[in-house]
Swiss-Prot record:
Subcellular location: Plastid, Chloroplast thylakoid membrane
GO cellular component: chloroplast thylakoid membrane; photosystem I
Xref: InterPro entries: PSI_PsaI, PSI_PsaI_sf
Gene: psaI
Transmembrane domains' residue ranges: 8-28
Name used for this protein in its record: Photosystem I reaction center subunit VIII
Record function comment: May help in the organization of the PsaL subunit.
GO biological process, one term: photosynthesis
Similarity field: Belongs to the PsaI family.
Membrane topology field: Single-pass membrane protein
UniProt keyword terms in alphabetical order: Chloroplast, Membrane, Photosynthesis, Photosystem I, Plastid, Thylakoid, Transmembrane, Transmembrane helix
NCBIfam families: PS_I_psaI
Length: 40
């Protein structure tokens, strides 16, 4: 049986920052789209 820390370390160390960056990027893109639509 594999030990859990060796499974969770890459998951938290790689997947969580990737999800955080992706959600932040989408949030900023949405705000930019809405702001440009309001100006036009």
């Amino acid at each position: 049986m594999i030990n859990l820390p060796s499974l969770f370390v890459p998951l938290v160390g790689l997947l969580f920052p990737a999800v955080a960056m992706a959600s932040l990027f989408l949030h900023v893109e949405k705000r930019l789209l809405f702001s440009t639509k309001k100006i036009n």
